[in-house]
Every structure is written in structure tokens, then in C-alpha cells.
Design a protein with these regions (language model features):
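Acidic, divalent-metal-coordinating active-site segment for phosphoryl/phosphodiester hydrolysis
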Residues: 28-34
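Helical "lid/coupling" subdomains associated with nucleotide-phosphate turnover
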Residues: 1-19, 34-36, 42-215
């Protein structure tokens, strides 16, 4: 899965000469890829998906700040094992998957700007992630369903996803992250098409990538 995420990101971002960390938060796992100058040097799959961590650390807890604190400690322990972070501090950090696309849309909305149809390539600061996490933690799941920029289907799991994201940013000492609207499904399409790490020239493949952009 990490390899598929990387194929997708490498098609949409110029990473030559950069030290990059790509994160894809799914339902059950977090896929991490560390790359230097466009070449993958490390990968990890951690049990830190948004659904899994909601079930293990968030669901049923009345004291949300305490639950989030516990999840963040758990995430930090897992993340420390994933990469030699002393070698990966302050990287270009790219997030793909629904947690990140929803984060991007909410961040734009919180700035008082119109939420665009595509959030691909937008940037969210670490401070914005922390502020959104703190704010969403004070809302019930029903209230989160009405948050501008948040897909109602993610109202139950967004807090856990952002808690993991916040720890990732902190551990990487990154000031911001860049949102990719393309993830595992797109990586699979690219692999099936035998595409190289450039934007595909086939218009049918381009259309398929747009249709399956993460929500």
C-alpha cells in the first residue's frame, strides 16, 4: 500500500532534490513513505488508521481531551518506530487520503475563503491542524456533521485522524503539510497502466484519476 501511495504522489508533485515524507491515512492503517530526491528509502505500515484509532481510543469516551491525549501518546510511540526521524526532520510532508483532503477543505473554510472543488496541492500549517483538532474535540459527532468542508461520513472519525496527523507533524518538525487528492486507488490505476512517475499522457487515465480523487 505504501508503494501505491508513493506512485500516486510522485505523479502529482515534483520531489526531485527534496527530502519528503508521504503519509496516507486509511481506515485501518497509516502508510508512511520516506523518499530522497524522488527515490524511496523507507516505508512503514502502522495500525493508526482513522477508523481503527477512533474505535480504540475515541469512541465511547466522555472526556474527549483525555482520549485525544491518550491517542496522541499511542501514535507517537508507533511513529517513532517507523522512521529514523533525526534524518527526516523538517521534510516536505505530503498527506493523501480522506483525512487530509477533509483537513484541507476545513482549513480553507476556517480562513473565511470559498472551499474549492479540488483541494489538491493546498497547504495546511501545523498551527491550523492543532487549532482544528482542539476545536473539533469540543463538538459532538452531530455538530461535526455540519462543519463546513467536512464530509458528513467522516464526522465520527476526523478527530482521530487529525490527532495522528498532529503527532506526525510534531515528530517530523514540519511547519506545514501539502494535501494530495490522490492516493491508493490512483496508485493502483497507475500501476495497472504501467505509468512512469510523470503525469499520465493518456486522457482516459487522467479522467479516471480525477474521478477517483480522495474525499
Amino acid at each position: 500500500e505504501a508503494t501505491l501511495s508513493w506512485r500516486s504522489v510522485a505523479h502529482h508533485f515534483q520531489l526531485d532534490g527534496a527530502r519528503a515524507v508521504v503519509a496516507d491515512i486509511g481506515g485501518g492503517s497509516l502508510e508512511l513513505i520516506g523518499a530522497v530526491d524522488g527515490l524511496v528509502e523507507a516505508t512503514a505500515s502502522l495500525p493508526l488508521g482513522a477508523v481503527r484509532t477512533t474505535e480504540t481510543h475515541i469512541a465511547g469516551h466522555r472526556d474527549m481531551p483525555k482520549a485525544i491525549e491518550g491517542l496522541r501518546r499511542h501514535a507517537r510511540r508507533q511513529l517513532r518506530k517507523a522512521l529514523p526521524w533525526r534524518e527526516w526532520t523538517a521534510p516536505v510532508l505530503i498527506g493523501s487520503g480522506g483525512t487530509f483532503t477533509n483537513l484541507g477543505r476545513m482549513a480553507v473554510a476556517r480562513r473565511g475563503l470559498p472551499v474549492p472543488d479540488s483541494i489538491h496541492g493546498s497547504r495546511v500549517t501545523t498551527a491550523e491542524v492543532e487549532q482544528l483538532l482542539e476545536w473539533l474535540a469540543t463538538r459532538t459527532a452531530e455538530q461535526r456533521r455540519h462543519v463546513l468542508g467536512l464530509n458528513v461520513e467522516r464526522a465520527d472519525i476526523i478527530v482521530a485522524g487529525l490527532a495522528v496527523t498532529a503527532e506526525l507533524l510534531d515528530l517530523a518538525d514540519a511547519r506545514e503539510l501539502t494535501v494530495s487528492a490522490f492516493g491508493l486507488r490512483e496508485g493502483l490505476l497507475l500501476e495497472m497502466a504501467g505509468a512512469t512517475p510523470q503525469l499520465p499522457s493518456d486522457p482516459l487515465l487522467q479522467a479516471a484519476l480525477l474521478v477517483y480523487a480522495s474525499d
